Amino acid sequence: MPRKGSVPKRDVLPDPIHNSKLVTKLINKIMLDGKRGTAQRILYSAFDIVQERSGRDAIEVFEEAINNIMPVLEVKARRVGGSNYQVPVEVRPERRTTLGLRWLVNYSRLRGEKTMEERLANEILDAANNTGGAVKKREDTHKMAEANKAFAHYRW
């Protein structure tokens, strides 16, 4: 906790091509070592691949994919009487989008395709069709929350 009050929340600027803050956040997640130009090139190439393969607008497919990835529930560890319980809690909207983007990028990086553009495009298409690693992660998170429903009364 900072001594001098809370730190102000910084807002991201919408990206110049699609005018979307969500796209900017995804670029920031893809970016490594401050190389924003490389991250933008990867994302826009991936969007071109998505549009080509799906025949729909890439932003629509991307937003559908993110909605399929974002978790509603997660578990948090809570210590009660000397033992740790996995307590299911609802995920705040800001954290939902952050987790969705993080999982999308992480599971894209784990894929087997040759270039990052192809990996990201295929993960977005898979997520839009409710398949793929990122959607599986969301399902696993929900299963954990469901399995620990008995400890829901420990919520704080």
From Swiss-Prot:
UniProt keyword list: Ribonucleoprotein, Ribosomal protein, RNA-binding, rRNA-binding, tRNA-binding
Gene field: rpsG
Family: Belongs to the universal ribosomal protein uS7 family.
GO biological process: translation
UniProt-recorded name of the protein: Small ribosomal subunit protein uS7
Claim: Transcription regulation is one of the keywords in the record: no
One Pfam family of this chain: Ribosomal_S7
Organism taxonomic ancestry: Bacteria, Bacillati, Bacillota, Bacilli, Bacillales
Subunit-structure text: Part of the 30S ribosomal subunit. Contacts proteins S9 and S11.
Annotated transmembrane regions: none
Organism in which the protein naturally occurs: Staphylococcus carnosus (strain TM300)
CDD domains: uS7_Bacteria
Any one GO cellular component localisation term in the record: small ribosomal subunit
Described function: One of the primary rRNA binding proteins, it binds directly to 16S rRNA where it nucleates assembly of the head domain of the 30S subunit. Is located at the subunit interface close to the decoding center, probably blocks exit of the E-site tRNA.
PANTHER family linked to this entry: RIBOSOMAL PROTEIN S7 (PTHR11205)
GO molecular function, one term: rRNA binding
